Every structure is written in C-alpha cells, then in structure tokens.
Design a protein with these regions (language model features):
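A Zn2+-metalloprotease active-site environment signal
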Residues: 4-7, 17-258
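Hydrophobic helical h-region of N-terminal Sec-dependent signal peptides
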Residues: 9-13
Length: 258
C-alpha cells in the first residue's frame, strides 16, 4: 500500500499542468505578486541606502544602468503578462557574484559579479537579459504554482497511504517531490531564461557570443561543478553547450541590427 501511495503521488504531480494558472487560483496572481515585489524592493533599497550599500554613482553602476536602460524597451515589447512592468534597478555594493530579479521587473545586481569577473558590457547584457526573461515569463509565479501542486500531490499521496507511513515513507515522498517536479522544473526555467536572454540581448544590439564567454568565466570561477541532475541550475558546461546550439538564431537577430 505504501508503494502504491508513492506511485499515485508521483503520477499526480507529473500529470497536472498549468503551474502559473494554479498560482493564480492559490492567490498568487500577477498583479498581487508585482505589488508585493514592489513593496519589498522599495524596502530593500531603502535599507541598502541607509547602510551605504546602494551604489548609484560608481563607474560599475553606470555601466550596469546603461545596459539596463538599453534592454528595457525591448523587454517591454516582449511583455505578454497583461501587466505593465515598472522596471527598476538596484546595484548593491557587495563582493557577491550574484544578480536576480523579482516579479514585475525589479532587477538587483551586485557589483561583485561585474568586478570579479571583469565583465564587458555585452556580458552584463547577457546576465541582464537572463534576469529580465525570468520576469517576463513570470518564472517566480510558475515556481509558486509548481510548489503548490507538489504540496497538493504530497498531501493526496500521504492521505491515501494513511497517517502512519513512517519517517522513511515521508522521506521518500519528499525526495520524489524534489526529483519529480521541483528541481527539474527549476532547471527548465533557467534554461528558458538563458535562451530568452540570448535573444533579448541580440535585439538590443549586444553580441550574443558574450553569453558564452560569460559562462566560461563563471566556469573558471566555480571550478568543477559535477553532475547537474540534482542542481537547481544547469551546469556551466551544459549551459555553454545549449547556448552554442542557440547562437545561430541569436546571431541572425544581432546581425540585422548592424
């Protein structure tokens, strides 16, 4: 019976689609997420400014901001969310090699990712395009929907098995939820953002080859990453390989701009 419950849970997770729609039903609609994101972003920037961690004037900031402003109109052209994005950028003084985006177009860059990797403007555009694609495709919303579906399926499976399935049974269900939908779906979102970012930077006139040189730099920084199967991101090597496959299409867009 326990095995049947685990199987039932896995099938339930894998056959339910429409994670973004499920997020809407769970109360995480686009307008609400974007509003919450705007509030959090404003609070974060206020706190960073108070701690003198918000960069608004350095040469690194100016380079990041120039790329942001150049990509923004092309990102707006691709916005099919039904919500107008109030794109905003925060550059934080930090050695961290990181950048991220919040719903509704709130982009955060750390100075460390530019300075430590000695990025060109084209390489900055590769990161910026990647993050903007996450926002445009509402990947945060999709992840919320996916997690809600996972929790629903786990609940169904646990209920079907009975309340005394034991620690081993619970551990198996949790592992199944990770492998069945959580991590692979997240890697899929990252791959979609890589592709979308490649095309977005090309539309704005940045050389898509820079996306490959960016991840080659990341590879050297990270060292050997090992297998990507249980990683939330594709391995750097896998990323580079996928980008090489998508490069001809991106270069065709880029060359039309020249």
């Amino acid at each position: 019976m326990k095995k049947l419950a685990l199987s039932f849970c896995a099938v339930t997770v894998m056959t339910i689609s429409g994670c973004a729609s499920f997020a809407d039903m769970a109360g995480a609609d686009s307008a609400t997420l974007n509003a919450q994101s705007a509030q959090s972003f404003a609070k974060m920037t206020q706190e960073a400014r108070a701690k003198n961690q918000l960069d608004t004037s350095s040469s690194t900031y100016q380079r990041i901001n120039s790329v942001f402003l150049r990509l923004k109109p092309y990102a707006d052209q691709l916005n099919q969310t039904g919500q107008r994005f109030d794109w905003q950028l925060a550059v934080l003084k930090s050695d961290s090699v990181n950048a991220y985006v919040a719903p509704g177009g709130k982009v955060v860059f750390y100075t460390g990712i530019v300075n430590k990797l000695n990025l060109s403007n084209d390489e900055i555009a590769a990161i910026m395009g990647h993050e903007m694609t996450h926002a445009l495709e509402e990947h945060a919303k999709s992840k919320i929907g996916a997690q809600a579906l996972t929790n629903l399926a786990i609940g169904i499976g646990t209920s079907y098995a009975g309340t005394n399935i034991g620690d081993l049974g619970n551990a198996a269900i949790n592992l199944g939820s990770q492998i069945g939908i959580g991590l692979p779906y997240s890697r899929n979102l990252e791959s979609r953002a890589d592709y979308g970012g490649l095309m977005l930077m090309a539309k704005a006139g940045y050389n898509p080859n820079a996306a490959i040189s960016l991840w080659e730099k990341m590879n050297r920084l990270d060292g050997a990453r090992g297998a990507s199967f249980l990683s939330t991101h594709p391995s750097n090597t896998q990323r580079i390989g996928d980008m090489r496959k998508n490069l001809p299409a991106a270069m065709a867009v880029y060359n039309k701009r020249r």
